């Protein structure tokens, strides 16, 4: 009998002939996620991944916590690996059940069996019936409740047999790095961290770009964005955060452009800078936290004018979500409490009181022609600070 970790994945199973590529990527990401906990053997078999510690006193709790944040994993379980012999299964199941009773005080149970090894002489229902009866005879304080048991004893009969009682849900999605790279425009608000998490869930690596308007925004605002990046890195393992000095550009726009156009012209400048960084880092798309109609710069007309300034595709994972839905995800992934800290970002300074909601591209381009934008953008890119944020 040996304690190991069972990893389940879902969407990867639909990938046909390319499935091994995604499985190998997931196994690589798993190895990176838990490498500091000690040496392990990672294997795959029959749509499962098994992690077998090679050292004593392995920290299973920490490993399970880390694995639950690895994109591509549906769920994980600490399991006992035993021989696929029914006598062995019965004896070890009783040991596990008695241990659970001592720790948790359970009174009722049921057995669920999956038989992947078709050479095993009993089918799944028969295994469950006979094993359940054996447990009842040897653990008289337990009773069966098939509808609402205190715990379920899971049995998977494969080349080896795996018994367990705990299933820990993970984040699902696709393995990080299996779908290229994108640049996330990361503010200090609620929306953009959620957008970054959602695009990363689809297997996309992130380069984050934050626009910093010192002294109009404080050092604490910068620290807040770094903290948000750290939270995202617990899922993404590593994120490069590009902190772009944006004050001169905002001052230029504020001085020379119609007040109602400030926001849309500022957004277009951000997109241009983000695209330059994307081209430098090999990213293939831009990602924002915009949602249709949420604010003036996020009407369909405004989004069309914003998109027109770049050639890369712009992904908006939150496009059809309302604020409550976004907040729910922010709370789930751990960014919400940091996002609501009351520190200004560049989007909250030089704000138009009555921003245009139906901008015309030709008029915006005419206003931009009054600006020394090329020089200011190049200067901002040259003076960008890059921080590498890791999950460790």
From Swiss-Prot:
Q: What is its EC number?
A: 2.8.1.4
Q: Which SUPFAM superfamilies match?
A: Adenine nucleotide alpha hydrolases-like, THUMP domain-like
Q: Main localisation, per the record? A: cytoplasm
Citing just one GO molecular function, the answer is: ATP binding
Q: Which GO terms describe its cellular component?
A: cytosol
User: What residue stretches are annotated with the THUMP domain?
Assistant: 61-168
Q: Which Gene3D superfamilies match?
A: 3.30.2130.30, HUPs
Q: Broadest EC class? A: transferase
Q: Which GO terms describe its biological process?
A: thiamine biosynthetic process; thiamine diphosphate biosynthetic process; thiazole biosynthetic process; tRNA 4-thiouridine biosynthesis
**Keyword vocabulary terms for this entry:** ATP-binding, Cytoplasm, Nucleotide-binding, RNA-binding, Thiamine biosynthesis, Transferase, tRNA-binding
Please give the catalytic activity noted in the UniProt record: [ThiI sulfur-carrier protein]-S-sulfanyl-L-cysteine + a uridine in tRNA + 2 reduced [2Fe-2S]-[ferredoxin] + ATP + H(+) = [ThiI sulfur-carrier protein]-L-cysteine + a 4-thiouridine in tRNA + 2 oxidized [2Fe-2S]-[ferredoxin] + AMP + diphosphate; [ThiS sulfur-carrier protein]-C-terminal Gly-Gly-AMP + S-sulfanyl-L-cysteinyl-[cysteine desulfurase] + AH2 = [ThiS sulfur-carrier protein]-C-terminal-Gly-aminoethanethioate + L-cysteinyl-[cysteine desulfurase] + A + AMP + 2 H(+)
InterPro entries of this UniProt entry? Rossmann-like_a/b/a_fold (IPR014729), ThiI_AANH (IPR020536), ThiI_fer (IPR054173), ThiI_N (IPR049961), THUMP_dom (IPR004114), THUMP_ThiI (IPR049962), tRNA_STrfase (IPR003720), tRNA_sulfurtransferase_ThiI (IPR050102)
Compartments annotated for it: namely:
Cytoplasm
A Pfam family that the UniProt record links to this protein: ThiI
Q: Which CDD domains does the annotation name?
A: PPase_ThiI, THUMP_ThiI
What pathway does this protein act in? Cofactor biosynthesis; thiamine diphosphate biosynthesis
Q: Which residues bind ATP?
A: 185-186, 210-211, 267, 289, 298
What does this gene product do?
A: Catalyzes the ATP-dependent transfer of a sulfur to tRNA to produce 4-thiouridine in position 8 of tRNAs, which functions as a near-UV photosensor. Also catalyzes the transfer of sulfur to the sulfur carrier protein ThiS, forming ThiS-thiocarboxylate. This is a step in the synthesis of thiazole, in the thiamine biosynthesis pathway. The sulfur is donated as persulfide by IscS.
Q: Which family does it belong to?
A: Belongs to the ThiI family.
Q: What is this protein called?
A: Probable tRNA sulfurtransferase
Organism per entry: Acetivibrio thermocellus (strain ATCC 27405 / DSM 1237 / JCM 9322 / NBRC 103400 / NCIMB 10682 / NRRL B-4536 / VPI 7372) (Clostridium thermocellum)
